[in-house]
Structures are given as structure tokens and as C-alpha cells.
């Protein structure tokens, strides 16, 4: 400020020093704070039934708890398993 009484005309502001260079923002990248924490993998046994005949189907997986939740949702809604007998009769061991 210049003068005894402050007013807008007395402001001595150099705005060029406050403006960031364009390349600083355009080329800016955020560095990761660290590796994301990896979830532990655990063994799970899944009991379900064969869609065509209703026989019991059991299998074991090693997965994270969140993956097991996703698999559970798939098995309850969209994905159906078959037993070995139905698989052989439906797909004839991969032969057409």
C-alpha cells in the first residue's frame, strides 16, 4: 500500500508472481503414498448344488474375503455349477 489512507488505487500488487506456470499443473503427477495394503488369502470350502440334478457339489478355493463375497453373489444369482455326472452328459468331455 502506498499512502496514509488505503484505497483500491493505492494497491501495488504484482499478480504475475502469483500465477503458476502452465507446465507445472499440466505435467503434475501424484506419487502413491505407498503400496496398497494387500488382503490376506484364506482357504474356503464352498458347498452348493448341481443346477440340473440337485446333487451336492463341493470345492475349495483360496481367496480374499471380498472375493468370497463376490463369488457368493454370483453363485446365488448368475452362475450355476454342475456335478461331474451332469458335466459329462451335457458336454461329453469336450466332444461335440
Swiss-Prot record:
Gene3D superfamilies per record: 3.30.160.330
Q: Name one GO biological process term.
A: symbiont-mediated perturbation of host cell cycle G1/S transition checkpoint
* Domain topic, free-text comment: The E7 terminal domain is an intrinsically disordered domain, whose flexibility and conformational transitions confer target adaptability to the oncoprotein. It allows adaptation to a variety of protein targets and exposes the PEST degradation sequence that regulates its turnover in the cell.
Q: At the top level of its lineage, which domain of life is listed?
A: Viruses
The record, for InterPro entries, names: Papilloma_E7
Where can the motif Nuclear export signal be found? 68-76
Subunit structure comment from the entry? Homodimer. Homooligomer. Interacts with host RB1; this interaction induces dissociation of RB1-E2F1 complex thereby disrupting RB1 activity. Interacts with host EP300; this interaction represses EP300 transcriptional activity. Interacts with protein E2; this interaction inhibits E7 oncogenic activity. Interacts with host TMEM173/STING; this interaction impairs the ability of TMEM173/STING to sense cytosolic DNA and promote the production of type I interferon (IFN-alpha and IFN-beta).
Pfam families xref list? E7
Kindly list the ranges of residues that form unnamed zinc fingers according to the record.
Answer: 50-86
Q: Where in the cell is it found?
A: Host cytoplasm; Host nucleus
**Which HAMAP family does the UniProt entry name for this protein?**
PPV_E7
**What UniProt keywords are attached to this protein's entry?**
Activator, DNA-binding, Early protein, G1/S host cell cycle checkpoint dysregulation by virus, Host cytoplasm, Host nucleus, Host-virus interaction, Inhibition of host innate immune response by virus, Inhibition of host interferon signaling pathway by virus, Interferon antiviral system evasion, Metal-binding, Modulation of host cell cycle by virus, Oncogene, Transcription, Transcription regulation, Viral immunoevasion, Zinc, Zinc-finger
Q: What gene is this protein translated from?
A: E7
What is the name listed in the Swiss-Prot or TrEMBL entry for this protein?
Protein E7
The keyword Cytoplasm appears for this protein = no
The function of this protein is: Plays a role in viral genome replication by driving entry of quiescent cells into the cell cycle. Stimulation of progression from G1 to S phase allows the virus to efficiently use the cellular DNA replicating machinery to achieve viral genome replication. E7 protein has both transforming and trans-activating activities. Induces the disassembly of the E2F1 transcription factor from RB1, with subsequent transcriptional activation of E2F1-regulated S-phase genes. Interferes with host histone deacetylation mediated by HDAC1 and HDAC2, leading to transcription activation.
Give the family per the record: Belongs to the papillomaviridae E7 protein family.
**Which taxonomic lineage is given here?**
Viruses, Monodnaviria, Shotokuvirae, Cossaviricota, Papovaviricetes
Q: How is it modified after translation?
A: Highly phosphorylated.
**GO annotation, cellular component aspect:** host cell cytoplasm; host cell nucleus
Amino acid at each position: 500500500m502506498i499512502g496514509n489512507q488505503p484505497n483500491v488505487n493505492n494497491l501495488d500488487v504484482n499478480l504475475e508472481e502469483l500465477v503458476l506456470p502452465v507446465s507445472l499443473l499440466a505435467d503434475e503427477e501424484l506419487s502413491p503414498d505407498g503400496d496398497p495394503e494387500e488382503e490376506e488369502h484364506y482357504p474356503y470350502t464352498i458347498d452348493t448344488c448341481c443346477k440340473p440334478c440337485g446333487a451336492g457339489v463341493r470345492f475349495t478355493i483360496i481367496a480374499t474375503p471380498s472375493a468370497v463375497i463376490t463369488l457368493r453373489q454370483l453363485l446365488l444369482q448368475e452362475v450355476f455349477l454342475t456335478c461331474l455326472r451332469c458335466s459329462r452328459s451335457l458336454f461329453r468331455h469336450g466332444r461335440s
